[in-house]
Amino acid sequence: MRSETIGTKRSPRATIAAIVAAAGQEFGSRGLAGARMEDIARRCGRTKQLIYHYYGSKEELFAEVVSRNHEAAILELIGHDYDHLEPVEAFRAYLHNVADQYRRFPEWAMLTLDENLHRGVHYNERRKLRSLTQPLVAQFRRVLDRGAATGVFNPDIDADKFYAAAFSMVTACFMTGQVLSEYLAVDMRTEAGVAEWVDYTIGLLLAAIRPRAGAESVKLALQGVTI
């Protein structure tokens, strides 16, 4: 590889973007423990020396990758407008958009799982996580509140807890789908199987918050019937 000095005329911003993009691919496929700085340098066409100039350690670079990905995901999600949709359709669209991010960026699943193993410390080192997620949950809360106001959702839903439940269920096919598909009669590997899972979980979540929920509504949702 051609030697590159810190004094290169390349734009520092472009260099950092290239490093972070390459690191995201490596961390997303190999995890924090398995990724090597040599491979990141090779992928982005820079030297290890230059990477260490910007990031003092592999852990610091990982922290930058996960925090940037998290922020990018939030900014994209809150950029959607749901106010023109009826509450039920807004709810569906919101969660479909969450799932779609993981479909388009499969490396995010590994980054999320890896960061969970490290108890979220890398998020907290680089950003205040809660301040980033507050606008996202507020957007979700508005959908729930509009549904409650029109009588299609139960009132007084804890938006934070319900968002956590919804996120966990909808993204399960990306986080643990390979394992679950191996020993259960479910398909979370193919595009059609993922789409079916996302629709199924959204149906269950809707059944839980609809005023007419009760046993019959939940039973239909468990059977995969749209309610």
Annotate the PLM regions:
Residues 1-3, 97-100, 104, 134-150, ...:
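C-terminal peripheral helix-coil segments that are non-catalytic and often amphipathic
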Residues 2-7, 65-94, 131:
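Amphipathic alpha-helical linker/stalk segments
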Residues 18, 22, 26-60, 64-65:
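Helix-turn-helix
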Residues 20, 62, 66, 70, ...:
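Amphipathic, non-transmembrane alpha-helical scaffold segments
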Residues 21, 88-117, 134, 160, ...:
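Amphipathic alpha-helical segments that line or abut small-molecule/effector binding pockets
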Residues 29-33, 84, 105, 150:
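Short coil/turn segments at alpha/beta junctions that flank glycine-rich nucleotide-binding fingerprints
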Residues 89, 128-132, 149-165, 217-222:
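All-alpha amphipathic helical-bundle segments outside canonical DNA-binding/catalytic cores
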Residues 104-127, 177-184:
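Amphipathic alpha-helical segments used for helix-helix packing
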